[in-house]
Amino acid sequence: MIVITKFLESIVDFLEKNVKRIFSYPGEQILPLYNEIEGSSIKNIMVRDERGAGFMADGYARITNHVGVCLVTAGPGATNLTTPIATSYKDSSAVIAITGRCSRDKIGKNYFQEIDMSFLNFYKGYFVKEPNLKYFEEAFSLSFQNKKPVHLNIPKDVYGEFTIEEEINLNEMKDNNKDNSKDNDNKGNDIVDKTFNWKTLINENEKFKKTLILIGQGIYGTLSYKEMEKISSVLKKLDIPIATTFPARGIINEKEENCVGLIGRRGVIKPLLEADRIINVSSSLSFNTYPESIRKKLLSKTENIHLTPKNIDEIKEFFETFGLGEPWETEKWKRISPQGDYSTKINEIIENIPENSIIITDAGKHTVFTCLLKTCVVPRNIIASHSFGTMGFSVPVSIGAKFGTIDFGIDREVVSISGDGGFLMNVEELQVISEHNLKILMIVMKNNSLAEFCKIKNPNINRLADAFDIDNCYIENVDEIPQTIREYVKKDKPMLVVVETRDEKLPRPNI
């Protein structure tokens, strides 16, 4: 049966069935869609910069394990999305980026804001040249299944045409991911190709005395948030050591007896070297996980399972069927002890916020100290730009994560930790926090410098918070932190805390 409807209405109907909220900034080339969404059941959050829309969609996707959607106009609207979409690509986050375009007859004719838009196709992009929902169906499926950003570029005149819902050959603008699959030693975000058959692994169990399971964030698959929380109860029953990559921390409570914890440059190395077999479950094996100096040695004894479960029963079945060999003892990751003023204050923050808080760090010294000082007990205990290292990440991603907790009934505090450099990169999004009264604790570690690079001069950040009508305070002494956090937890509104710190050198990576 052929169904004919107006394409604009078809898009909004599709979005209403698949998303609860989008993050957007209006502009000429998307006005038809923007206005139609405003009149729909979809919650439309207007950001204050297009970068914010991309980052918020990213944060929403990471905490919910669902798709995050952003909508921006053509030209400068789309170019502003470059950094957040690159971040979601490198960090493997399911983001749909919808951008506007001038009418099809004006493309390539130097029209206002008209440029080639394929720069957003880090993973996949579709030029929606025809009024067909297949573009949307394919984009959402790809993004959700593969946890990557997908770009939908829609010319303005297509909205007014009528949809013919029949099979078409999708017109891909460009797939920039081809060069990312050259060899196993340099795969970037992609899973190593050499994937073993389960039966082969089972038959070989007796050959190995020291099997280590390494789990990456890919194991979240398409699970609901509630099912993500159940993975730890499956893993803690296993007898052999389990290690995690940085983004997968908390997938098993790091207090469990069989949890080795974080491995790699900022984790422990010894279990990787001692194991005679490593079962890699859904990790991309980045250079942070397998450092370059020992990478080839580790890859030679690694067997890969690309498990992308649809429900918790599939994870149970895998580990029950697999059987994993004998238990063995090895070194475990341990949180460091704070040494200087900076790490002592970070530690005091971590010790006083709820243990299951969603801590979202920016890029910088505070990120490393948070990683080294926090014991992760639940999935997404720490969210960071672990593969792209994006400054200006924390505040807008925290906003997206907070909206995700609201939409999906996730009862956890959201805590943003930034340096004074990164905080000022997206400070305009404080208006979104204020406007929606989002309960987010924002910590700014103020040391008036960009790591070891240079000194910087800051504005009065507390007065900035005042301008956005956000409660705030200034802390110099570490003893002030516990009471400040206790007061925040009691309230139902946002708070910004500026923590004056003295500089401190980072511990050296383990390798």
What residue spans do the PLM features occupy?
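Phosphate/pyrophosphate-binding active-site segments
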Residues: 1-6, 153, 165-170, 176-177, ...
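N-terminal alpha/beta PP-like core and its mobile active-site loop of ThDP/TPP-dependent enzymes
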Residues: 2-321, 411-413, 439-442
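Active-site diphosphate/adenylate-binding microenvironment
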Residues: 7-13, 17, 25-38, 327-405
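Active-site nucleophile and cofactor-binding loops and adjacent substrate-binding regions
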Residues: 25-27, 45-55, 70-76, 362-363, ...
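Short amphipathic alpha-helices and their capping/turn segments at secondary-structure boundaries
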Residues: 85-87, 140-143, 349-352, 430-435, ...
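Thiamine diphosphate
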Residues: 98, 106-118, 272, 312, ...
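Conserved thiamine diphosphate
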Residues: 112-148, 275, 282, 326-337, ...
